[in-house]
């Protein structure tokens, strides 16, 4: 599903410039046809029981900034978002959620390419940016949560995708800092991640209904998977050790309604045995760190290539 197509990037700016900006223009921007119920029927018949539905929201949180743009790039600084989700976009997201739920599968609905390396990313793991965008982020999740507050446990909300620091650092915060790793900058990024996660939980729970106990997914910095058997940096586990599980009011029979997410990509395809050992070492590392958190872990993305 390409509800995560990022129209703020130069390659997709044609959506804003030359069309009526209907949901299908975004949905097909990366070459995929309009999503139909048959797609999820196929997944169900193939044995899948859960679908992650990635959605990028920023092109649909206020249209004035695109109409005023004269360049082929969008700047979240010069053309700020209003935060009001376009009803047509929310309706389309709702339709696809229903496609999934109707197959009796779990649906994980998220905020996707509002994060990442795109020039349009407005969710940045940075203390100053968090303070600036906290109200906007809260407003977005409040609207999503209100839209689906009566849905049952098959619908899960995911806070954000791969949120990066101001240096677009992967693997751990401040990896790409000019002059090398900065402890101050790294801590600022990790604190921002923790604040975003807590804000997400608070916003959803405040809407009531079934959101009071809905299962919620929070993600590590950049969705990092930590160290494996190639410990090339002492900072690889920081996205884990610096992560603080949000305070949450939802507890059933002593169990929290929170899930932690990481992503895992293995780039070495030349030696399958080495790739296998790397994956096993990653899982072993996860097991050694997270039992104390007492919440499940999911691998929301995985693959042999980026």
Predicted regions and their residues:
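Short intrinsically disordered, low-complexity coil segments enriched in acidic
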Residues: 1-8, 51, 297, 306
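Short, solvent-exposed beta-strand-terminating loops
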Residues: 1-13, 59-65
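Active-site loop signature of alpha/beta-hydrolase-fold enzymes
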Residues: 3, 58-60, 114, 165-166, ...
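Short, solvent-exposed loop/turn and secondary-structure capping segments
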Residues: 6-7, 63-65, 119-120, 168-170, ...
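A solvent-exposed, charged loop/short amphipathic helix patch at secondary-structure junctions
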Residues: 7-26, 69-80, 171-185
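A general, composition-driven signal for non-globular sequence regions
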Residues: 8-11, 15, 46, 106, ...
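Extracellular glycoside hydrolase catalytic/binding regions
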Residues: 21-24, 138-142, 146-154, 160-306
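An active-site-proximal structural segment forming one wall of the substrate-binding cleft
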Residues: 22-51, 55, 59-61, 65-159, ...
């Amino acid at each position: 599903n390409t509800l995560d197509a990022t129209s703020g990037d130069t390659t997709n700016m044609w959506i804003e410039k030359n069309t009526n900006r209907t949901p299908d223009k975004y949905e097909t921007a990366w070459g995929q046809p309009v999503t139909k119920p048959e797609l999820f029927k196929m997944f169900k018949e193939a044995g899948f029981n859960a679908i992650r539905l990635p959605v990028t929201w920023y092109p649909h949180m206020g249209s004035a900034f695109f109409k005023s743009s004269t360049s082929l790039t969008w700047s979240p600084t010069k053309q700020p978002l209003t935060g009001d989700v376009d009803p047509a976009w929310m309706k389309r997201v709702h339709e696809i959620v229903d496609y999934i739920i109707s197959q009796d599968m779990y649906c994980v609905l998220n905020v996707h390419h509002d994060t990442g390396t795109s020039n349009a990313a407005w969710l940045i793991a940075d203390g100053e940016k968090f303070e600036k965008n906290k109200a906007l982020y809260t407003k977005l999740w409040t609207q999503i949560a209100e839209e689906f507050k009566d849905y049952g446990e098959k619908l899960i909300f995911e806070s954000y995708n791969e949120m990066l620091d101001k240096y677009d650092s992967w693997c751990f915060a401040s990896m790409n800092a000019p002059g090398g790793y900065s402890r101050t900058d790294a801590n600022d990024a990790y604190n921002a991640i923790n604040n975003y996660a807590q804000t997400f939980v608070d916003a959803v729970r405040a809407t009531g209904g079934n959101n009071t106990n809905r299962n919620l997914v929070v993600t590590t910095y950049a969705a990092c998977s930590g160290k494996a058997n190639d410990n090339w940096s002492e900072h690889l586990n920081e996205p884990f050790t610096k992560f603080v599980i949000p305070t949450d009011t939802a507890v059933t029979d002593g169990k929290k309604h929170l899930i932690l997410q990481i992503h895992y990509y293995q780039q070495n395809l030349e030696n399958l045995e080495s790739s296998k050992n790397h994956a096993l070492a990653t899982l072993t590392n996860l097991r050694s760190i997270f039992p104390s958190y007492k919440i499940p872990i999911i691998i929301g993305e995985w693959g042999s290539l980026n």
